[in-house]
């Protein structure tokens, strides 16, 4: 009986731990420079290597390219096999051999869309495609008058059929599969479902998106991507055209049912290029991943980059999400989202996976199309994430704050209101109003900590050197709360103090506005309410209102 009781207690504690893990809101260490030669990290890379080799063996893959980036550098890469997998005398693969990235091309098309929206070339992502491409039409028998929009096309929510209405073997022929032919065929077809009824992956939608964007920008799609995306990112060995890369193209294979292999023919996509015809190298794609993991305002505004990587549609499995056009999955083991895009054409299967909170990116490419849920990136991420988090914390990394630090705030031309820094002591005190609102600032630990008269604590930090009277509050331990509390409550709010000068040249705060409520200083003592047994009958009313 005693043994059973101990077992029951152990099981209960495990269940409590798992519930807390599931219900808590994870936070991640700030990506800082770490020692890439650390034995723990080198062991992790070796395990990734073993995963790839096992996957190659299990799926009959003869040649493979893998690269991992962290922050702004390639930290690990390895190639397996030869440029021609069927010729042992062929040169060994390198990360400078071209591959077909197939549907990863869609991320370039969507990036073009965000650029043109930000420039004002298209006025809104919710503009209907027909506004810029009046020749396009498709039948609609549903109870809606709306035609597909840029946002719907870019995120597979348009209800368009999956494929361009042209035989695959003819796509490269601009006469057989000309724009006029495709548009004429579409005019006799119908939407397969209303927009936003369900995610329906559509190569046609992205091809139409790219061609419509080109019309809006009065240019060719391929020319735009080359000049506005590829070259600015240093992707000089990437192209939409076979002739540009044929001298360094890695050869893809076809594996037949009888176990034999042949070199896959290269069939280009013509009008459908925006959906999947970009050739690139692993080195070039590392530059591309580093763009998504970091910031490059010359390519895309940082706020738009966040928008571009946001979810659009949650699938019924509860942990898979479609974006524009990233396909995202939640790594349950490590409590983190992985933003991914995979592509497959005859002879090639490639996946780009981005773990943006940690600034880790993976580009894995097989010179053989094969059928598995991913290109080994999920297993690799499950190894890399905990190791990186451990090493980051050991290196002194602090938990992330998603707000913009002072170094990234836009300078203003206004004169600062205060000529000297406001000391932390000036903010300390208990602030109240007649409605029962409470805001308490304490620095007894050496750091500014705030609360709204309850047990939920907030770290307090400076907002900007230009506005020293404005502070920011952040939930002290977000991992202890539901994510809903973290995003729905007062987390990351700004609080505005009224500053006055004392007769002896000092500075004091006599009121504060927090969460829209203005409160005056009741006492410089943060324990004022508790020490005086003061209760405000409305004190919890406001608090609960903002936590609902």
Curated annotation (Swiss-Prot):
InterPro entries assigned to the protein according to its UniProt record, in alphabetical order: Beta-lactam-related, Beta-lactam/transpept-like, Beta-lactamase-like_AB/R
Disulfide bond annotation, renumbered to this chain: none
Record field: transmembrane: none
Glycan-carrying positions: 237, 258, 443, 459
Keywords noted in UniProt: Glycoprotein, Secreted, Signal
Signal peptide (UniProt feature, chain positions): 1-24
One Pfam family, short name: Beta-lactamase
One Gene Ontology cellular component annotation held by this UniProt entry: extracellular region
Highest taxon, organism lineage: Eukaryota
Residue ranges the record marks as coiled coil: none
Database matches in Gene3D superfamilies: DD-peptidase/beta-lactamase superfamily
Protein location: Secreted
Family named by the database record: Belongs to the beta-lactamase family.
Identification of the protein by name: Beta-lactamase-like protein 2
Species for this entry: Dictyostelium discoideum (Social amoeba)
């Amino acid at each position: 009986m005693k043994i059973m009781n101990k077992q029951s207690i152990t099981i209960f504690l495990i269940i409590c731990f798992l519930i807390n893990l599931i219900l808590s809101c994870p936070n991640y260490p700030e990506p800082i420079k770490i020692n890439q030669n650390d034995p723990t990290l080198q062991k992790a890379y070796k395990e990734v290597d073993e995963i790839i080799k096992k996957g190659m063996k299990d799926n009959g893959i003869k040649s493979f390219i893998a690269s991992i980036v962290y922050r702004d550098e390639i930290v690990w890469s390895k190639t397996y096999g030869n440029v021609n997998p069927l010729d042992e005398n062929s040169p060994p693969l390198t990360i400078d051999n071209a591959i077909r990235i197939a549907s990863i091309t869609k991320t370039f098309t969507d990036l073009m869309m965000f650029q043109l929206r930000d420039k004002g070339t298209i006025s809104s992502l919710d503009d209907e495609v027909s506004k810029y491409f009046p020749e396009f039409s498709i039948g609609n028998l549903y109870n809606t008058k709306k035609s597909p929009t840029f946002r719907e096309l870019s995120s597979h929510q348009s209800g368009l059929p999956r494929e361009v209405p042209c035989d695959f073997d003819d796509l490269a022929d601009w006469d057989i599969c000309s724009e006029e032919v495709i548009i004429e065929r579409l005019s006799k077809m119908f939407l397969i479902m209303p927009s936003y009824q369900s995610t329906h992956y559509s190569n046609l939608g992205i091809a139409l998106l790219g061609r419509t964007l080109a019309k809006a920008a009065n240019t060719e799609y391929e020319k735009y991507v080359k000049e506005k995306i590829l070259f600015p990112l240093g992707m000089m060995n990437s192209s939409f055209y076979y002739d540009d890369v044929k001298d360094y193209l890695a050869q893809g294979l076809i594996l037949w049912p009888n176990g034999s292999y042949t070199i896959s023919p290269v069939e280009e996509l013509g009008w459908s290029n925006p959906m999947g015809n970009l050739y690139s190298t692993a080195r070039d794609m590392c530059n591309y991943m580093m763009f998504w993991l970091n910031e490059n305002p010359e390519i895309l505004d940082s706020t738009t980059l966040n928008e571009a990587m946001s979810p659009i549609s949650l699938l019924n499995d509860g942990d898979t999400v479609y974006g524009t056009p990233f396909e995202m999955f939640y790594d349950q083991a490590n409590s983190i989202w992985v933003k991914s895009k995979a592509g497959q054409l005859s002879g090639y299967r490639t996946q780009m996976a981005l773990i943006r909170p940690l600034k880790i990116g993976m580009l894995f490419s097989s010179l053989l199309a094969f059928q598995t849920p991913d290109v080994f990136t999920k297993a690799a991420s499950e190894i890399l994430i905990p190791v990186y988090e451990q090493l980051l914390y050991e290196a002194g990394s602090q938990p992330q704050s998603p707000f913009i630090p002072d170094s990234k705030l836009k300078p203003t031309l206004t004169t600062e209101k205060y000529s000297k820094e406001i000391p932390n002591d000036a903010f300390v005190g208990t602030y109240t109003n007649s409605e029962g609102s409470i805001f308490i600032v304490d620095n007894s630990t050496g750091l500014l900590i705030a609360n709204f008269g309850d047990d939920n604590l907030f770290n307090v930090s400076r907002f900007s050197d230009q506005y020293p009277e404005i502070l920011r509050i952040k939930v002290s331990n977000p991992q202890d709360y539901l994510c809903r509390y973290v995003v729905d409550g007062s987390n990351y709010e700004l609080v505005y103090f009224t500053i006055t000068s004392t007769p002896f040249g000092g500075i004091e705060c006599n009121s504060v506005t927090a969460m829209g409520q203005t409160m005056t200083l009741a006492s410089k003592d943060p324990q004022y309410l508790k020490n005086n047994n003061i209760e405000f009958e409305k004190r919890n009313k406001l608090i609960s209102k903002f936590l609902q």
